[in-house]
Amino acid sequence: MPLRPVLLFYGRASCSPCTEARDSLQWILEDRASRGELVPVVRDLDVATDPDLERRYGALVPVVVIGDAELPLVTSVRQLRAFLDATLPLLA
């Protein structure tokens, strides 16, 4: 079985847009799995725990990264779904 791609989710524990984006991501990934589509492994990273991550992503959270593709300031299900639909097939 091929390895599943890794999706990095950068956020903060005390960030309501991050919580909303996490919930949206979970819903989208469950939907993808139910349709037999590729679902990445998700690594949730809190930028507040690492000064380098805070400098790079602090003003942009929530941020989703797959491979070399980044989606900063994730704000909608449509935006997140389009990002996954565009990036995941390239890694399959």
Regions found by a protein language model. Name each.
Residues 66-92:
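Non-catalytic, surface beta->alpha helical segment in thiol-disulfide oxidoreductase systems
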Residues 17, 21-25, 53, 76, ...:
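Amphipathic alpha-helical interface surfaces
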Residues 29-37, 91:
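Alpha-helix termini
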Residues 13, 45, 68:
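Conserved short-loop catalytic and cofactor-binding motifs
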Residues 1-31:
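Local sequence-structure signature of Cys/Sec-based thiol-disulfide redox active-site neighborhoods
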Residues 54-64:
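Structural micro-motif
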Residues 37-51:
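Thiol-based oxidoreductase modules, predominantly thioredoxin-like and allied folds used
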